[in-house]
Amino acid sequence: MSISAALVKQLREVTGAGMMDCKTALAETGGDLEAAVDWLRKKGISKADKKAGRTAAEGLIGLAADATSAVAVEVNSETDFVARNDAFQELVRNIAQVALGTDGNVEAVSAASYPGSGKSVADAVRDAIATIGENMALRRSAKLSVSKGAVATYVHNSVSEGLGKIGVLVAIETEGNAEAARNFGRQVAMHVAATNPLALSEAEVDPAAVAREKEIFSDQARQSGKPENIIEKMVEGRLRKFYEEVVLVKQAFVINPDLTIEKALKEAEKEIGAPAKITGFIRFALGEGVERESSDFAAEVAAAAKK
């Protein structure tokens, strides 16, 4: 089959492998991008541990919190220029506050009343499209709550209070000092923003992702020519390393790399004054998994000139 240059370029961006290696990988896998990533990894050509999600939408992540809960929303716009617009920022801030009063489900947030308008959030977004003159949408929303303790928030690349390009929530359940729990939770939220863990615990890692890694590790280990019992131990070691990289509580704490998050929490309990547990986290990065339509500027100009 014919492999397009665009597909080769996309595989290179994901894996960092050479052009000919990418072309061969795509030819061997029938043009399947994800299978080509695995093919390169099995050959030891790609050093990518996981495929990075492409961030291609503009807009803002908005966070809002009260004593025992917090919410994250993503509102997309077509351009970054609009994301810097005061009216758009107010829209996102208000939607986050509305979401805090719901269960966090995006449909519930869209249907909820927008403050001071007598309209729904969905209607308020439509009004903003007409006023600002650019398409926009409430893409997603999520909420974390605790019965006792705190839900900490952190915004990376903040453009205004509670608004930015990456937003993180971390829930800490404890009978101890809620403010101390919130302070530690904020540090963990900063860590999550930086490391983007896949799951809170080993048990929560997608079994399909684990199976995929085991298959890749096994193929890599067999290329060493070592006996099967040694290969099993090699795979176990690599899988342990995989968990340390992608599971939040197993990760080295970016603020103090000598401690894992698990151990840092034990240390924080001294300040909190009671046992504490991280019960959940949410990380929203703007435009995660959404691809912007690319355009050829020269072709656009040529087309416009012919009109």
Swiss-Prot record:
Keywords, sorted A to Z: Cytoplasm, Elongation factor, Protein biosynthesis
For region Involved in Mg(2+) ion dislocation from EF-Tu, the annotated ranges are: 79-82
Main localization, broad class: cytoplasm
Q: Does the keyword Kinase apply?
A: no
Q: What CDD domains does the database record attribute to this sequence?
A: UBA_EF-Ts
Annotated localization: Cytoplasm
Classification via PANTHER family: ELONGATION FACTOR TS (PTHR11741), ELONGATION FACTOR TS, MITOCHONDRIAL (PTHR11741:SF0)
- Biological function: Associates with the EF-Tu.GDP complex and induces the exchange of GDP to GTP. It remains bound to the aminoacyl-tRNA.EF-Tu.GTP complex up to the GTP hydrolysis stage on the ribosome.
Know the name of this protein?
Elongation factor Ts
| Species this chain originates from | Chelativorans sp. (strain BNC1)
Q: Which gene encodes it?
A: tsf
